[in-house]
Structures are given as C-alpha cells and as structure tokens.
Amino acid sequence: MKSKNKILAVTAFAMLSLMGCNIDPILTDSYSEDVAWSNVDNLRLNLNGFYSLIGGYYGSEVENDACTDILKMNGPRDSENLFVFGSAPITPAANPFNNWDNRHTWQLSCCRFLHNLAEHRGNFPESIANEAEAEARFFRALVNFDLAKRFGASFILHKELPVMGEKNHARCTPEECWDFIYEDLTFAAKYLPKRWDDATKDPWGEATHTGRVTQGAAWGMLARAMLYAQRWKDASDAALEVKKLGYALYKNPSRPDKGYGELFMNRRSARVDNNESIIECGYSYDDEMDYSFDYFYCPPSDGGYAEASPTEDLVSAYEMADGREFSWSDPTMKANPYVGREPRFYASILYNGAPWKGQTLYTYEGCNDGYALGGGTTCTGYYMRSE
C-alpha cells in the first residue's frame, strides 16, 4: 500500500512539474506567421493562393453555359440537362450554382490577409504594402461581387476580420454592398501597377508576376460590377479608364484568323506582347502534362470525350466575313452555311466538313463523330475548336 502511495505521489509531482514547464514545440510541417510575413518574396507567395479564384472561372464552371442557349451537354443524364429540362429541380439544397459557403470563406480569408498585413506592414516598403493590399482588396471585391450577383446584394458583409465567437451579424443593404465593392476596386486601381515588371524573380529564379492582376483588371471588374448595380455613370467611367490604358486586340496578320486563335495557344512562358488580355488564367504547359480540354471537348475520332457542344444559337451568332449577320432565311447562306464566315468562326467551331488535323470532320448521324445516343459525341452537329 505504501509503495502504491509513493507511485501516485511521484506521478502527481511529475504532472505538476510538466504543467509548470513552457512546452512550445517547433513545428516542422508548416511556416510560422513571422516567416510568412518576413520578406517581400514570402508576401507575394502568400498572395498567390488567391489566384485560384480566377482559375475557377476557366474550369468546370465553363459548363454552366450549358444552362443557357449557347452550349449543350452531350450526355443525356448530365446534371445541366437534368436541371434545364426539369428532371432535377433546383432547390435550396440542390443548386448547381451555389457557392455561398465557398465565397464567404474566401471573404474571410481576404479579411484575414489584410488584418495580418496591417500588423506586419512595417516589414515592407510602403509601395509594396500598398500593392499587396490592392491585390487582396481586388479579390475581396471579386468574391463579394460573386455573392451579390448570385444571391442579391444583401448578405453578411465582413469589412474586417470578425472577433472570434462574435455572432448575429446584420446583413448589409444593397447600397452598402455595392459601395464596398466600389471602394475596394478603386483602391486596387489606384495602387496596382499598369503592368508588372517580369524582371523580378522569385526564389526559384522564375518570373513571379505573369498573370497577376493589374490596374486594368481592377477598372474592368469595377465596370462590370457597376453594371449589375445599375450605377451606369460609375460603370461608364471605369470602362473609360480601361480604354485609357491602351488595351487593343491581339493581331497576327500572317494568320487567316488574324491571330484570334493564336491568342489562346501562346505559352505563358513565351512573354508574348499581348495588349488584349486584361484578366487571364494562364496554363503552365510542358511536354509531360496534357491539357484536359483536348480530351473533354474534342471529337471522338481525335480521342476526345466530346462532353459539350456549341449550339446553333452560338454558331449562327458568328457573322459573315463582310460583317452581315448570318441567317438561315437567306438562300445563299443556307446553301453554304460554313462558307464566307468571319475568322473567329473558323478558329472556334468544328462543323460538318471542317478540315481538322489533316482530315475532314463529318458530324452527320451515323459517322464516327456524328450524333449517337448516350453521349460522347455531338448532339448539335458541332464541336468546340482549340488548335
């Protein structure tokens, strides 16, 4: 019994001793806040995480167009077809356009970044701190704009990082929402550069700034947001600021399409002189990585899955080369619907009889690339084109 009491006493003493110790292990699987905010390189790496918000618009969200009149999913049971034809009604619990949780999470992430930047602002030159704040505020405006246009401009709007445990936040008014988006984007337009200096390298020797948002991106996003807000003067003024920055169509006179198709095929690393791109999502291509677009949208004879196809509504929207509108009511146009169309048509649409990779593409029913039940081939007679 005495031995047992001694063991208990020693154990209790050891536990009390440990409670008095300052055990602060060094984490080896993540960086501390001090490291993340210690220099300009780390600051910009921290900002890189926000750019997935732009990439999302060029991923699966492209297929949201299949709920409109310009794109059609080829699989009969694809969710977009089920929603459009009412087989799967849209409800609060089943909404293909729902990004409420995602955008509110990003809203808080932006506020957290700005809060931490304010605490560590002294580590950076004022110009760098202003640039970083401008980038973060651009993305905060982007997610708030996304919430406003999908759910209405009255939601819980966090202008600062909320206090832990704080509840019952009031919803903002539409005026407060649009004013806040306006303030964030005008700040971004003021402090973002017109063009980033790609001579600046990251710690791995690569250019860090290709594809970063610019002054033009901020003005352009503001123009679009103010259209949704029905603030026509603000939208017009912002669009004029974009125009002043000297953006112009990308041109290559040596190509039949004058460079339109080439614009989307230039490697991001090529440093192409491109004055058309205002906001872009670049694809870091190398010889060991395939671009999934080729599989998901190319014709089956080319090894593709043909997940979605452009509709006749979209195809007919392309004009004739002389600027006239295309019309099936015109006997001449109807006789040769794919002759004499504008260059963008031939760079974007694969049609019956189109030349494609050294062969002629046929999309009529019964051929390899024609309509068939079950998906995997076109249901409209057309395919998207990306050379």
In which residue ranges do the predicted regions lie?
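Conserved, well-structured interaction surfaces
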Residues: 39-56, 78-152, 166-179, 185-195, ...
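Flexible, polar/acidic helix-loop-strand segments at domain edges
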Residues: 275-276, 331-387
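Bacterial Sec-type N-terminal signal peptides, specifically the leucine/valine-rich hydrophobic h-region
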Residues: 18-20, 144
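Membrane-proximal, proline-rich intrinsically disordered regions
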Residues: 21-64, 318-324, 330, 335
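Bacterial N-terminal signal peptides
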Residues: 10-17
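Bacterial N-terminal signal peptides that target proteins for export
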Residues: 1-9
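Polar, glycine-rich mid-to-C-terminal structural blocks
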Residues: 227-231, 242-334
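Hydrophobic, small-residue-rich alpha-helical packing segments that form membrane-like cores
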Residues: 160-162, 166-230, 236-263
